[in-house]
Amino acid sequence: HPNHEQKYCEESKQYDDHMIKNYDYKDMVYLSDDEMREVTGSDTYYGGSYDEAEAHCHPLNYALGIAKATLSAGAKIYENSPATSYKVLDDHVRVNTKNGSIKADRIVLACNGYLENLEKSLTSKILPMNNYIVATKPLDDETVQKINPKDIAFADSRFVINYFRMSADKRLLFGGGENYSQELSKNIVPIVTRPLEKIYPFLN
């Protein structure tokens, strides 16, 4: 967790100490300014927290794994049939879709930020926010060693965070930049490359 301003470093140290003292979690390590710049390959960062037990998650494989486990448990998955409404009746719940309906004993609204108008009591409580990610072309070994020699997944201290890691085929996956709308941006490249180029100006 690299800090983009020096003032956040003390908070990182306190967080590491808290995890160690209160949870006996001894994998938290505080990295100095120089150490953080060495592992990120960027002089834009100061010190920060490093979780030595951290892991990377492949979102698509994770979703496919959940789907596989769901099917193995006996559930059915209806693709391309979004729920448009539901009604709780005496002995079941009726879920309506564009082309039909499903009878269920109970339902779980697990829609992340994409609930839309399915549950109107929550509509006004959801802030639409889109965050974007780009991937570079495959990088040579020298560049990989320069920008991420320990193969760490980073998320920095900015309010609109920048997060980045290497892919299996040596691309830099970089997320950053947001818009607050139901509509996706038509051109995400400049939104994401601006913060990327500030951190890694040589990756142009």
Pin down the residues of each PLM region.
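A generic structural signal for well-ordered alpha-helical segments enriched in polar/charged residues
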Residues: 21, 68, 72, 194-198
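A conserved short coil-to-beta-strand element within the FAD-binding core of flavoproteins
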Residues: 30-42, 75-93
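Surface-exposed helix-capping loop/turn segments at secondary-structure junctions
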Residues: 23-26, 72-76, 200-204
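Rossmann-like flavin
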Residues: 1-69
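General structural feature for long, well-ordered alpha-helical segments within catalytic domains
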Residues: 8-11, 15, 32, 62, ...
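Active-site substrate-recognition segment that forms the wall
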Residues: 83-95, 100-141, 145-204
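Phosphate-binding active sites in nucleotide-utilizing proteins
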Residues: 54, 67, 71-77, 88, ...
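Short, contiguous, pocket-lining structural segments
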Residues: 51-62, 78, 99, 184, ...
